[in-house]
Design a protein with these regions (language model features):
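Surface-exposed alpha-helical segments enriched in charged/polar residues
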Residues: 30, 74-81
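C-terminal interaction segment
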Residues: 117-120
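Amphipathic coiled-coil/heptad-repeat helices and related helical stalk/stem segments
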Residues: 46-47, 72-75
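Acidic-basic catalytic patches of nuclease active cores, encompassing PD-(D/E)XK
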Residues: 1-44
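Nucleic-acid nuclease catalytic cores
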Residues: 66-71, 80-114
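Conserved catalytic cores of phosphodiester-cleaving nucleases, focusing on short active-site segments
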Residues: 53-66, 79
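Catalytic centers of nucleases
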Residues: 44-56
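Short glycine/proline-enriched coil/turn segments at helix->beta-strand junctions
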Residues: 33-37, 55-58, 82-86, 105
Length: 120
């Protein structure tokens, strides 16, 4: 699976800022399906932890609000060490600046506010 195809699907989503994280997951799932991208939702790969979306080695991690940078980096550090993870796309409501690579894996930030044009 090419990251570009996933990013194209994500760029088609326009959501209200009143949606909760579960509703955002539904919108992402709908966009991925429309673009014929097969995914696993709430994919359990770590004990007591699930990836929001798993797409052939690419993890989509969804955050409704702006997370703590340290907390996010710690989470991404754990995720990038999981065998089979090739890249992580972090879908955020607000942008956070983090490295573009971690443990040799690509990290991409997709900001709802900047890239999706949240509707009110």
């Amino acid at each position: 699976m090419k990251i570009e195809k996933i990013m194209d699907a994500l760029s088609t989503i326009h959501i209200s800022n009143t949606l909760n994280e579960s509703e955002i997951h539904k919108e992402i799932g709908r966009a991925l399906s429309i673009h014929n991208i097969k995914y696993k939702h709430e994919y359990q790969i770590l004990t007591h932890k699930r990836f929001d979306f798993w797409i052939d080695g690419i993890v989509l991690e969804v955050k409704k609000s702006k997370p703590s940078k340290i907390t996010l980096l710690n989470q991404l550090d754990r995720y990038t060490k999981v065998p089979g993870v090739k890249a992580i796309i972090v879908v955020l409501e607000r942008n956070v600046t983090i490295p573009k690579q971690l443990n040799g894996k690509t990290i991409i930030i997709k900001s709802l506010n900047e890239n999706w044009g949240i509707t009110v």
